[in-house]
Amino acid sequence: MDYELYTKDEYLDFHDIFDKYNFSQELLNKVDGIRSLAASIHAEVNQYYDDSKPYVYHLDMVADQFMYLYKTAVKHFEAKELDDDTLLMLLFAAYFHDTIEDCRIHYYDVEKYALRFFRKKYATQAAEIVFSLTEEKGKTRADRHNDKYYNGIANTTYASCIKTADMCANMIYSWYKSRKRYEDYYNEWTDCKMKMLDNTGIEFSHNIFCVAQEYIKFIPALYPTLDKKELLLSEEDVENISKIAGDCASGNYLIRPRADEYLKKFSETMEILSKADDEKTGRDKQITEYFYACSEPKLFYLFCGKYGLKDGKDEYERYYN
C-alpha cells in the first residue's frame, strides 16, 4: 500500500491539498468556495482549532484525509471512481461536518448553503451527513458519542467515510501534540469502528473502511515525532541483517517451513555482530528488532518511525521488490 506522508505543522495552503488530485478548474473553484464558506462560518463564532489555529486548519486535514482514503481505496481496493457531484458533496460534508455542532446553525441552513454548489438531491444528502455527525447531548465525550450517535452515522449514506476521515485527522494531529490524546482517539476508533460501519449498502464506504483499518495502524510510523530513539545499528549491521531476512522469501519467514533454519542462522549472525561492538548498550535488542521488522511491512514501518528512518519505505522496497 502506498502512503503519502502528511507532516506539515503549519497552516495548510488550500492548493497544496488539492493540486495533486488533478481536479478540473471548475471543480477546484467549487471546492475553494465551499472551503471559504465553511471557514467564515466557523470564524464568525470565533472558533479555533487547538486554541490558536483557524478552524479551517482542521477542516483541511479532514478533507485531505478523505481524499487520501478515497484515492487509496480506488487504487488498492478496486473502489469505483466517484462522479464529480458525489465527490463535491462529500468534500462539502468534510468541510461542514462540525457546523451544526459548533456554529449555531441547523440542518436546513446546511442544506441552503449546499444548494449554492449543487442540486437539491446532493444538497439534502450533504445535510443528512452533517446532521448525522452532530454529537448528542451529554456531560462526557462518551455520552455525546453514544450508540444513537454511531447508529445515525451507520444508517446515513457515506457518513462513515467522513467520520473516518475526521478521526484520522484527529489521530494524526494529536500524535504530534499529545500522546495521551492520540491514545484516546485511537481507543475511540477501536471501540466505535464496528458501530459506525455502513448499513446503507454502499460498497464505497466499506472500501474506505478497509483502507482506514490498515492506515491507522501505521500512523505512529508514518508521522514520526521528534522524540525518536537512537539507532545503534551501523550500515554494515543493516546490510547483513537485511540479507538474512531477504533469504526468507520476502520476509514471510514466520509462516514458512524453514523458519527454524532461518532463525538459527540469524541467531548465529546476531552473535557475531554483537561481539563486534559490545559497548553499544541496547544494540543486541535493536539487531533482533530490526530482523523481525524486516519480516513484515507493518513492523518495518514502525521500526523506521521509532528510529527516525524517513527512507524506510524505500529501503524496504530495495530488498523485497
Residue ranges and their predicted role:
Residues 1-321:
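Active-site helical microenvironments for divalent-metal-assisted chemistry
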